[in-house]
Amino acid sequence: MRNSTTIWLAAADSIFNLLPSMNKGEYTMAQNPIVTIEMENGDIIKAELYPEIAPNTVKNFISLVKKGYYDGLIFHRVINGFMIQGGCPDGTGMGGPGYSIKGEFAQNGFANDLKHTEGVLSMARSMMPDSAGSQFFIMHKNAPHLDGAYAAFGKVIEGQDIVNKIATTQTDYSDRPLKKQIMKKVTVDTFGVDYEEPEKC
């Protein structure tokens, strides 16, 4: 009887480790994709992506990363106490990949309750809900007014101090860093999982 109980507990523990856990609006799942952003100066930011929260957004981000889309791009908009934004191919905040995806957030009819807390990754967009393409931002500090209005899809697991450093760099009147904050190389580890191309608008 003791052996069967031990086996059952071990099995239950294995199942538990595969399930998403929720704590104060934070999510984690074993073997979720991990994105690594290597800055030009050698600094590293690592973030876990949440396909269970924003599946098409994650597919889109992974697709762009695998194509080398973000390599050499900059964080063109930096606001201390708020967020750092990058992913524009022309570095102005006006560019994108040539397509858009559906906004996976509550105000657009999609159940996504990931909060915009420190370190969370989310998709930038225009006033139109389905206008996100490649631009994303990383939260420097909590911004609850964004909750439900933007497609949050991941969170920094290593290098939040680098995010903080970028967020406090000197900027001009348009929130553009005076010294370019360049993403030298962006890679992703999907741990053997194949992610399809995203659905596009």
Question: Which residues does each predicted region cover?
Answer:
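Cyclophilin-like peptidyl-prolyl cis-trans isomerases
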Residues: 14, 20-201
